[in-house]
């Protein structure tokens, strides 16, 4: 009896541990889902920024293809100012094919500091550099460089955390509903699985569904014989 009781406890403990492990995996899966969604969104933003750089380079192509002495730097500066005004683009610069700076707009930060080549700007890993060639009639006429701010704002980070917490809460609510339904539907009932040799109730017979004794064949036959008996005089 003691050995069977010990086996039953070990069996129940193993089931509980497996359920807890699955619950932890579901929680981590919710975090992974939110993180993958955030990474996919970052890739989408990078693709959109690359498309924007190509469009700006296409707009600068007629200006840059007019020759080194005839480049209208004011038009280039106006385009860059419009590009960097109240946006995630921190700065933008246009260079000639030999590296000469034509115009720049945005934050007044040196390229070496922006790229953290000297290690003086620890927050530069939140910046993403985009370089796009400006095509001309006879070949490249210059280059466009943009600095994209990839830092996640506090509101965006909080939104991701709220999504993760909501998924975890839904998992816990589903678990609680399952436990309540199981206890409500199985409370006071014993089924065939309780005849398992690992349970202490293995030797106790299982009662069948509640049936009225009047519905048994013997009761029906007895009732029929009673109905056919002659009445006592």
Swiss-Prot record:
Subcellular location: Cell membrane
Compositional bias annotation for Acidic residues: 208-217
Region ranges (Disordered): 204-233
Signal peptide positions (record): 1-33
Membrane-crossing residue ranges in chain numbering: 166-186
Domain of life: Bacteria
Membrane topology, as annotated: Single-pass membrane protein
Main location: membrane
Pfam families: SMP_2
Presence of keyword Hydrolase: no
GO cellular component: plasma membrane
Keywords, alphabetical: Cell membrane, Membrane, Signal, Transmembrane, Transmembrane helix
S-S bonds: none
NCBIfam families listed in its UniProt record: PRK11246.1
UniProt record similarity statement: Belongs to the Smp family.
Name assigned to this protein: Protein Smp
Gene: smp
